[in-house]
């Protein structure tokens, strides 16, 4: 096929501009990204060769080679991995996957460190070569294709690129960077080695360079015809913990998670017994951009006897721990394991149980830290992944108690929206006569904090948890108690805050009896809007509030389901009125404006709990009429 010149996808042009102009001060990341791509190409070859050993083409020793030519001012990264066909070269080097494009650009902050971190995360690392090169030449051939189907891809990083078919004997990919003026420091063995050891020491593939020795006569380093490996070239997780430094763990995390930030915590151990495997797990310090996408692929990298099998093996972790990154290397699974086999395998179930327990132990260590730095780390973790972890209450029955201990909530104990109250903290502060853990759900912290349902709790000094995450109502349908104490909504059913003395009981009964004509007339007036109307003593400042019956769906959950486009049963609340409030005291069952007052008390209560009025115009008209009659 003859040479073709093609235009870059518009987003790639934008990306190239960013690479060249915005990330210059962090330019050495280009080598990290290109080495990482070469390592992935080797992993893919190993995986495909499990089915077809001929793909090795008599060259089974996988490696990455770095070389440079001072005269030509070029730097070359060469691998003997899977390689690319012509179509793959056009697809991989000319476009960015559409799904990630918009998110990538929306995440760019202008902070060079943070923006550099996004490059690997979004799979656009190849283009980082243009930070230091004004032209890139890629020669490649896919394993299994004939030598006549080699490909040359070339671009100056402007608007287009050319693709040509060439003869290429060796499989794999050779990337040649034609360096920009001022980048001569990269034409140095010492400089390249230092970048490799900084970013890519953990890569399990040997990274080779020609040895150099000092030539006394020439007074300079001279290249020898002998290779040396410039990285450790062993799978980091196979080493003893004592042989791995903190810095090496951090670098490995950045490689495996495509993240430029350090992890919050990690755990590394070998498990022997029913199943034998090594696990190296990390807790990231921030959530990936697509964590909530329906097609988000969480999971760990799976290896069998150090052979890479798959990325994102989600069967090794429950969904609520999908943010955990890392590696599992099994000694028992077959090398030809597929995603289907993973679903059925007894060994995988044992690994999943073990990995889940280990991940929860890691989170427990973070949560129980006594020092300020440790506490700060758990706060960081909770703000990034707290809502995901809450899913575990419903998804993981076996570990529900452990997950519940890790949960954090805002509460009336503090005057901030910080979610830093553990259920154990709440229980420790409970009043001697208190038997339940009380909570309120709302759309926002402000709405929860100012809910009329909290008035009597404030008066009696009883703490209430303020729940404002979308997942909370769903979670509460599984979390019925903690430490033997039932969880109770302040907006559901009858309220019991402890025994009343005889005088109080008698006074309340008399008030209820006196209000009966008003209550009955209100029920009749409001009709199908309410399930019931009753006198309450839970309010101190507000005239009315809405509560759900014990077995009914709350108004908050109904609104959430509707917002998600799901069918929700109609909400028929109970209207509770405060007999001590002046507005309620002034109600006359036979008054001409009784109907307007009834609807106003209902609408006010609905608004106070975050609901939406069915007919705002009537509400305004009714309110104006009542204000005018009072003013007159």
Curated annotation (Swiss-Prot):
Family annotation (PROSITE patterns): HSP90
Pfam families: HATPase_c_3, HSP90
Keyword Mitochondrion among record annotations: no
GO MF annotations, alphabetized: ATP binding; ATP hydrolysis activity; ATP-dependent protein folding chaperone; unfolded protein binding
Transmembrane region(s): none
CDD domains reported for this sequence: HATPase_Hsp90-like
Gene Ontology, cellular component aspect: cytoplasm
Matches recorded under InterPro entries: HATPase_C_sf, Heat_shock_protein_90_CS, HSP90_C, Hsp90_fam, Hsp90_N, Ribosomal_Su5_D2-typ_SF
Annotated region (B), positions in chain: 340-559
Record keywords: ATP-binding, Chaperone, Cytoplasm, Nucleotide-binding, Stress response
Paired cysteines (S-S): none
Region (A): 1-339
Region (C) residue spans: 560-632
NCBIfam families: PRK05218.1 (NF003555)
Function: Molecular chaperone. Has ATPase activity.
The protein's name in its UniProt record: Chaperone protein HtpG
Gene of this entry: htpG
């Amino acid at each position: 096929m003859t040479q073709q010149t093609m235009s870059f996808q518009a987003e790639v042009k934008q990306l190239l501009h960013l690479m060249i102009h915005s990330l210059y001060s962090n330019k050495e990341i280009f080598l990290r990204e290109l080495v990482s791509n070469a390592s992935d190409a080797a992993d893919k070859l190993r995986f495909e060769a499990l089915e077809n050993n001929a793909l090795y083409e008599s060259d089974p020793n996988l490696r990455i080679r770095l070389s440079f030519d001072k005269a030509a001012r070029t730097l070359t990264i060469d691998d003997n991995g899977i390689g690319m066909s012509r179509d793959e070269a056009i697809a991989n080097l000319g476009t960015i996957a559409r799904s990630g494009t918009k998110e990538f650009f929306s995440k760019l902050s202008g902070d060079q460190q943070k923006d550099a971190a996004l490059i690997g995360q979004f799979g656009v690392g190849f283009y980082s070569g243009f930070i230091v090169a004004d032209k890139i030449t890629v020669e490649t051939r896919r394993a299994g294709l004939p030598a006549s189907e080699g490909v040359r891809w070339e671009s100056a990083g402007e608007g287009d690129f050319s693709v040509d078919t060439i003869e290429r004997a060796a499989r794999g990919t050779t990337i040649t960077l034609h360096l920009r003026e001022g980048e001569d420091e990269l034409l140095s063995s010492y400089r390249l080695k230092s970048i490799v050891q900084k970013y890519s020491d953990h890569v399990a593939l040997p990274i080779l360079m020609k040895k150099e020795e000092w030539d006394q006569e020439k007074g300079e380093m001279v290249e020898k015809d002998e290779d040396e490996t410039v990285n450790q070239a062993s799978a980091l997780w196979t080493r003893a913990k004592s042989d791995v430094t903190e810095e090496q763990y951090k670098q490995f995390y950045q490689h495996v998670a495509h993240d430029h930030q350090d992890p919050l915590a990690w755990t590394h151990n070998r498990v022997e017994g029913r199943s034998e495997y090594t696990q190296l797990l990390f807790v990231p310090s921030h959530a990936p951009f697509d964590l909530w996408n329906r097609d988000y692929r969480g999971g760990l990298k799976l290896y069998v006897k150090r052979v890479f099998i798959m990325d994102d093996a989600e069967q090794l972790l429950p969904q609520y721990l999908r943010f955990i990154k890392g590696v599992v290397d099994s000694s028992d699974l077959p090398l030809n394991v597929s995603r289907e086999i993973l679903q059925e395998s007894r060994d995988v179930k044992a690994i999943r149980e073990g990995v889940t327990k280990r991940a929860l132990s890691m989170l427990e260590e973070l949560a129980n830290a006594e020092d300020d730095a440790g506490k700060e780390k758990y706060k960081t973790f909770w703000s990034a992944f707290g809502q995901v972890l809450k899913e575990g209450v419903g998804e993981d029955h076996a570990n529900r108690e452990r997950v519940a201990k890790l949960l954090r909530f805002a509460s009336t104990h503090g005057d901030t929206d910080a979610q830093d109250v553990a259920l154990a903290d709440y229980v420790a502060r409970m009043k001697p006569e208190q038997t339940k853990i009380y909570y309120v759900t709302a759309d926002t912290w402000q709405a929860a904090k100012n809910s009329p349902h909290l008035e009597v709790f404030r008066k009696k000094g009883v703490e209430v948890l303020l729940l404002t995450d979308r997942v909370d109502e769903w979670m509460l349908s599984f979390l019925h108690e903690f430490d033997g104490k039932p969880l109770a909504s302040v907006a559901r059913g009858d309220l019991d805050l402890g025994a009343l003395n005889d005088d109080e009981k008698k006074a309340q009964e008399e008030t209820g009896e006196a209000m009966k004509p008003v209550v009955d007339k209100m029920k009749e007036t409001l009709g199908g809007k309410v399930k019931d109307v009753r006198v309450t003593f839970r309010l101190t400042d507000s005239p009315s509030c809405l509560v759900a019956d014990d077995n009914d769906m709350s108004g908050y959950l109904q609104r959430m389901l509707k917002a998600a486009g799901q069918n929700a049963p109609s909400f028929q609340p109970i209207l509770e009125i405060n007999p001590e409030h002046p507005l309620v005291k002034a109600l006359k069952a036979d008054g001409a404006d009784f109907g307007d007052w009834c609807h106003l008390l209902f609408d006010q209560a609905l608004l106070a709990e975050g609901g939406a009025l069915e007919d705002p115009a009537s509400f305004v008209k009714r309110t104006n009429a009542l204000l005018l009659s009072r003013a007159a």
